[in-house]
Structure formats: structure tokens, C-alpha cells
């Protein structure tokens, strides 16, 4: 088993999908959390100057979704066939495209709040409708077992619902999928013990 070290801020953010995958697979890793004040000093030492990064026996992988895809493949959560893997990737990329619309780093709180409200009110319904249609009456987004696409929906929707609690009320199937993910024993245990952070 390789030695894993995941480095990110003390947030769920873009590293949480990786933490879900580690938790579900029962893989030991170092969850290294940076404090914001330390970032200017550390940033020049990080490849491409962004986190998260995953060190695998000293080899550094950057980009959160590249890390997550690697972990999903290693833990059997990428999809059972090449087509399933492509579909799971497509769902993750669709959700990620939406999450990238938000001005997460905006310092002006009025500007940030207005932008968030606009996205959640005017753009989120289309995403939720499309995800609901894709899920249909299936238990999981892709195939007959859970994949990292289901985890990514749970991770991202947790953040979205913290900003607009009734966001998915019209989509009980998507909410039920969240419940199924969070009922998985390893995920439930991780959610219970993880540090409580805003995002």
C-alpha cells in the first residue's frame, strides 16, 4: 500500500471528494490541513501553486479531480466498464462546471452574496433538472453500485444546501441519493468525525 499525504486547507472544499474516497475504501492517509496564514509561505513550494495535492510515495499529483479519479480507480469506484467510467466522469464534470461558476474567492461580501443568489436562483434549477432526469429511478447515477459521481453529488450538494436549504426540494430522487450516500457506514463515520467547516 502506498503512503498517501493529502494537502489542502482546513475546509471540505475541493479535497472532500478525495477524503470520501479514502474513507469508503478504508485507505490510510495523512490529512494535512493548511492554515490560511501559512499559505503565502507554502505556495511557492507547491507544483502549479494550487491545492489540493496528493503525494503518493513522494510523487505529487495536483488538480482535485485528477486526484479523485486516481483514487476512484484505485478503490473500484470509477465505474465497472469503460462506458460507466466515462458516464461517471461526465456527471462529475457537469457538477464541477456548475460549482466553478461561484466566485468563491470574492472578498466583497455584497458582490459575493448577489452572485451566489443569482446562480442558485437562476442557474441551479437547470442543473438539478438535468441530474434528476439522468438519475431517473436508478439507485445510483451510473451502473448498479455506488461510484465517485454519487460521492461528488453529495459533497457539492452539501455545500449548495448550506447556502439555500430548499434548493433541491423539488427533486426528492436527488435528495434520496444524498441519503443513500450518507448512509454508507464508512461515509457516515467520516461525516461524523470530520472537522466542522463552513465549506
Swiss-Prot record:
Q: Which residues form the GST N-terminal domain?
A: 2-79
- Cofactor binding annotation: Glutathione is required for the prostaglandin D synthase activity.
| Function field | Bifunctional enzyme which catalyzes both the conversion of PGH2 to PGD2, a prostaglandin involved in smooth muscle contraction/relaxation and a potent inhibitor of platelet aggregation, and the conjugation of glutathione with a wide range of aryl halides, organic isothiocyanates and alpha,beta-unsaturated carbonyls. Also exhibits low glutathione-peroxidase activity towards cumene hydroperoxide and t-butyl hydroperoxide.
The protein's required cofactor(s) are namely: glutathione
| InterPro entries given in the database record | Glutathione-S-Trfase_C-like, Glutathione-S-Trfase_C_sf, Glutathione_S-Trfase_N, GST_C, GST_superfamily, Thioredoxin-like_sf
Could you give a GO molecular-function term held by this entry?
magnesium ion binding
In which residues is glutathione bound? 8, 14, 39, 49-51, 63-64
Q: What is this protein called?
A: Hematopoietic prostaglandin D synthase
Keywords of the record, alphabetical order, are: Cytoplasm, Fatty acid biosynthesis, Fatty acid metabolism, Isomerase, Lipid biosynthesis, Lipid metabolism, Prostaglandin biosynthesis, Prostaglandin metabolism, Transferase
Tissue and organ expression note: Highly expressed in liver, kidney, small intestine and colon, moderately in pancreas, bone marrow, lung and ovary, and expressed at low levels in spleen, thymus, heart and brain. Not detected in oviduct or skin (at protein level). Expressed in liver.
Name the principal localization, coarsely classed.
cytoplasm
